[in-house]
C-alpha cells in the first residue's frame, strides 16, 4: 500500500485488494476488525476528540506508578462513530492508544428521521428510541424533529455530533459527572441502535473484535 500499511488479516487483505471498498461492507462482512489502518483506508478524514484525561496511580513492588487514562471518541459526522479509553505513561501515548482502539470499535449508526413531528426520509436524527448503560449511568436517546438540535449534556453532545446526529432528545440517569461512563453509555446506546438491524452472525463477530 502507498501509505506503508501491510494488511495482517483476511479483512485487511480484502480491503487492500479492492474487494471491500466501504466501511459498511467491512462491518457486514462477518470478519473481525482488528487493524486501525483498515479504518483509515475506508474512512479517511475521521475526526477525534479527547473527552477526558485522568492520572491513575497504582502501587507496585517498586513503588507508586503513575499512568494517564484518556477517553476518546472518533467519528466522520455522517453515521460512523467509535469510542475507547487508553492508558500509557505519557498523555500522547494514551491518546493514540485510545484512538487506535476506538477505530476497532467503529459502528454504523442508523441515521434517520424517526420523530413523528418530522418528515420521513431525512438523516438528521435517529430511527427509533435507544438506550445504553455503563456503570451506574444510563443514557436514553430519542428521535427529534429537524431544527431542534441536541438537547444533551456536553459529553453526550460530543459523541452524537461525531456520529452525525443533529437532532435528538436525551435523558441521563446515574452518576453523570463521570465522563468515562457517560460517554460509554452514549456510545452503547448508539451501538444498540446499530445492532438492532445487524445480522446475528455479524453481531457476534463484532463483539469478539471489541473484547
Curated annotation (Swiss-Prot):
List each copy of the S5 DRBM domain by range. 46-109
For this entry, the protein name equals Small ribosomal subunit protein uS5
Chain intervals with Basic and acidic residues compositional bias: 197-211
Tell me how this protein assembles.
Answer: Part of the 30S ribosomal subunit. Contacts protein S4.
Native species of this protein? Answer: Natronomonas pharaonis (strain ATCC 35678 / DSM 2160 / CIP 103997 / JCM 8858 / NBRC 14720 / NCIMB 2260 / Gabara) (Halobacterium pharaonis)
GO CC, sorted alphabetically, is:
cytosolic small ribosomal subunit
User: Could you give the domain comment from the record?
Assistant: The N-terminal domain interacts with the head of the 30S subunit; the C-terminal domain interacts with the body and contacts protein S4. The interaction surface between S4 and S5 is involved in control of translational fidelity.
Spell out the molecular function terms from Gene Ontology: rRNA binding; structural constituent of ribosome
Report the HAMAP family cross-referenced here. Answer: Ribosomal_uS5_A
User: Record's Pfam families?
Assistant: Ribosomal_S5 (PF00333), Ribosomal_S5_C (PF03719)
InterPro entries noted in UniProt: Ribosomal_Su5_D2-typ_SF, Ribosomal_uS5, Ribosomal_uS5_arc, Ribosomal_uS5_C, Ribosomal_uS5_euk/arc, Ribosomal_uS5_N, Ribosomal_uS5_N_CS, Ribsml_uS5_D2-typ_fold_subgr
Main function: With S4 and S12 plays an important role in translational accuracy.
| Keyword annotations of the record | Ribonucleoprotein, Ribosomal protein, RNA-binding, rRNA-binding
Q: Which GO terms describe its biological process?
A: translation
Lineage of the species this protein comes from: Archaea, Methanobacteriati, Methanobacteriota, Stenosarchaea group, Halobacteria
Give the family, as the similarity comment puts it. Answer: Belongs to the universal ribosomal protein uS5 family.
User: Which residue ranges does the record annotate as region Disordered?
Assistant: 191-211
